[in-house]
Amino acid sequence: TYAIGKFTNGFLADRSNINRFMTTGLLITALVNLCLGFTNSFILFAILWGISGWFQSMGAASCVVGLSRWFTDKERGSYYGFWSASHNIGEALTFLIIASIVSVLGWRYGFFGAGIVGLIGALIVWKFFHDTPESMGFPSVNVPKQKKEMSETETADFNKAQRQVLLMPAIWILALSSAFMYISRYAINSWGVFYLEAQKGYS
């Protein structure tokens, strides 16, 4: 659900008020996490987990759209780098903090803790994550470019260039590298805990 949500919610975020969009996603994710802490049924747990994944995916889409609305082409790469780093740092911190909570209070409190932090985060997003510069009285950072009609020859050359890019081996190597990197990352995230328990005796 998270993967499908990242795909579909990107289109929705483009057409939405990202303040409300991201706040809604984070708020519902937080509430679902609180519900997960009370759940005893496996089926209900799986359903709630899927719902959580869907609404979590609204966050990345909102942030990417926000970067495009608030920063110019020259600035966007730098701020995207900060955003990407914060995502990974935040994930690492959650492992440490939630693991500490679970080891002391039990697994249910891991969801309670995440839910409470999510509620606080939703409030912060609603207060400070604004939709567009215009909504705050600032000028738009994206000046519309005058469109130029391309001739048939230019259109053909453009389409040919696109096909050439898709045929470049380096593009496919990068795409496959990214795919395998994420497979390794999520395999470690998902199964690393079980490995440490089964093979290393951690509890």
Regions found by a protein language model. Name each.
Residues 20-34:
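Structural signature of the two symmetry-related core transmembrane helices
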Residues 2-7, 91-92:
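Residue-level signature of mid-helix packing/kink "hotspots" within the transmembrane helices
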Residues 41-49, 173-174:
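Short hydrophobic/alpha-helical segments at membrane-entry points of transmembrane helices
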Residues 17, 38-43:
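Helix-breaking motifs and short loop linkers at transmembrane-helix boundaries and internal kinks
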Residues 83-134:
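Helix-loop-helix hairpin linking two adjacent transmembrane segments in secondary transporters
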Residues 136-174, 199:
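Juxtamembrane intracellular "pre-TM" segments in multi-pass secondary transporters
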Residues 48-89:
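Cytoplasmic helix-loop-helix junction between adjacent transmembrane helices
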Residues 168-203:
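Extracytoplasmic gate region of multi-pass secondary transporters
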